[in-house]
Amino acid sequence: MGPLATAYFIEMVVKMTDAQFDYEHIPMVIYNKPDTPDRTKYILDKNMDNPLCAMMSLAKALEGQGVHYIAIPCVTAYYFYNELSEGIKIPIINMVDETAAYLKNRKIQRVGIMATNGTITGGFFRQGIEDLGIKVVEPSGKCQDKLMGIIYDGIKANKPFAMDDFCMVEKELRDKGAEVIVLGCTELSLIRRDFAIGTGFLDAMEVLAQKSVMLCSGKLKEEFNDIIT
């Protein structure tokens, strides 16, 4: 639903697949519909347009195309995961649960989350991680405002933004004891791609891409087994 994030997700899946020839790659059906009502706006204010109907229409359209799994490269959309899953007969890969499981398997004990206001307020990412016994720290209000500026005024608007703001949020989460910081917004994946942000990050969209390759009978390149920087 975010066009840049969607394009990058496709690139991730292709690059993660160990394929020598085109026909060894995973067949994909892409439905890019950026006019879907904003998920964060609705989570914060239920008087805003509810995106569920539009997302359900997308899911049913993909189901009609004969896909076996649906991957949604938008973390905030997982606020609606249960309702979407109940409305179709094919599985939606749960990026939140898969990220939490990945952290648990790596024995991470304390995690920081960078995400939209919708994801933070909705609490579903925090809950998904805490359910596996991992402690979660989140940005303060001031740092969250900086992060939203990066996501909405910078990346989504395709405009420059201050990496110093990103570093400020990172420092706060590290100071709170985060061993790993989850990039819990697919727009933030583009920062991971375009900037040298250092170690100790896990990109939730990379987890989704990795799981997509594995579920769809693709062969995962060995270098993508460990995706914590």
Where does each model-flagged region fall?
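Non-catalytic structural scaffold of enzyme domains
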Residues: 1-229
